[in-house]
Amino acid sequence: MSSFGYDPYFSTSYKRRYVETPRVHISSVRSGYSTARSAYSSYSAPVSSSLSVRRSYSSSSGSLMPSLENLDLSQVAAISNDLKSIRTQEKAQLQDLNDRFASFIERVHELEQQNKVLEAELLVLRQKHSEPSRFRALYEQEIRDLRLAAEDATNEKQALQGEREGLEETLRNLQARYEEEVLSREDAEGRLMEARKGADEAALARAELEKRIDSLMDEIAFLKKVHEEEIAELQAQIQYAQISVEMDVSSKPDLSAALKDIRAQYEKLAAKNMQNAEEWFKSRFTVLTESAAKNTDAVRAAKDEVSESRRLLKAKTLEIEACRGMNEALEKQLQELEDKQNADISAMQDTINKLENELRSTKSEMARYLKEYQDLLNVKMALDIEIAAYRKLLEGEETRLSFTSVGSITSGYSQSSQVFGRSAYSGLQSSSYLMSARSFPAYYTSHVQEEQTEVEETIEATKAEEAKDEPPSEGEAEEEEKEKEEGEEEEGAEEEEAAKDESEDTKEEEEGGEGEEEDTKESEEEEKKEESAGEEQVAKKKD
């Protein structure tokens, strides 16, 4: 920024208006005007004050004409010093305003970039979540599918429970059969024990019989031996008797017949005894053989019954073990199915909870984004309002600075006027001052125009030096030409306004002593005209 208030953010026409001229603040011009335009006066109070001073100067150009001759050089020097100090203050204030405005513009650019980024993110989110009802329908469809799956799992569980009840009934029947088989096994074991006991008794009886057979065989052998000995002894006796009979026969012939009779009797008796012994032995052996055969059949039947009982017991035991294994497998399968169903139900419930949480988080995120977007819109609107206010303020400053020199000189020379009841630095609040300020001479207008011309020439010289250091491009040359044209148009407009002011001053001198209400109306009309002219200039700048 140069010493003449040059700022790269502003156009040349705006820079021409920001010259180092003093600023005169008027706290209150007229009560009616301040109440009617309070909103605008909060941003453009210096503008209205300068315009009031300017009108005061233009209206009082005739009445103060004689008083100028009475001014001495000391007062003029003091006024010039005051004007210099005011210009210095104005320069500092303008630099501060330019810096603030530049910072505001940077802040606005930064916020616009952030707004663009957020709008892009919002657009992406809207595209991503363009149909929240579709997600809701998808979630609801998935929830319905999961509920149907849960119902199917419940139905399957009920079917498995029915099957489990049937298996439990089968198990109870098998357990009843098992108990019956256990009882029959115990009965068979009891009968087997009795059969074993009978077999043992039969074996003992057989052993006794075998012992008795052995003893009888020994007795038969002994009897045979005794019989043979007896036969031998009898034969010996017979031979001895025969010899003796022969001897007697020789002596007594009748003894041989007697010996034959005795031998025949003994032979008959021995044959009879042998036959009786053989018959008794045979009958006894037959009885023992029959009893042994009977006992053997009973033992064999008992053994067969025991083996059959063992086979049945083993088969029932295997069947019971198979039923137990099947029961355990079914219970294990049922437990696995229950665990699987519980796990599936818990997983489905977790999925439902997760989807509900995601839906809630998505809704909250959408609400947060909408709130942030609303906040950004509010901030953007506030910034737009603030920018519009600053634009209005800058337009008012542009309008005010075009007439600041006239107002400053008027406020400086107002110290020597007896019409004013107070200093120009105390606020210039009285209406009598405004009425007397209209009598200032017209040649101060030319002096102000000369100062503005000098300032513009200085700015153009500064721009020419900068252009030498940095050659302008085609676009910048076109912009400079446009700015020159705008400056010429503004100068023509200012000349027209000066001519209008002179004509208005002439009319005001003729009208002379009108009241404050007419002045207020005229000032409002002038302000409206200047506002329309400023808006036209702003529109031209924008174009």
UniProtKB/Swiss-Prot annotation:
One of its GO terms (molecular function) is phospholipase binding. It comes from Mus musculus. Belongs to the intermediate filament family. This is Neurofilament light polypeptide. The modification N-acetylserine is found at residue 2. Residues 94-125 are annotated as: Coil 1A. Keywords: Acetylation, Cell projection, Coiled coil, Cytoplasm, Cytoskeleton, Glycoprotein, Intermediate filament, Methylation, Phosphoprotein, Ubl conjugation. It comes from the Eukaryota. The extra mass and high charge density that distinguish the neurofilament proteins from all other intermediate filament proteins are due to the tailpiece extensions. This region may form a charged scaffolding structure suitable for interaction with other neuronal components or ions. It is found in: Cell projection, Axon; Cytoplasm, Cytoskeleton. Neurofilaments usually contain three intermediate filament proteins: NEFL, NEFM, and NEFH which are involved in the maintenance of neuronal caliber. May additionally cooperate with the neuronal intermediate filament proteins PRPH and INA to form neuronal filamentous networks. Glycans are attached at residues 21, 27. Residues 235-253 are annotated as: Linker 12. The gene is Nefl.
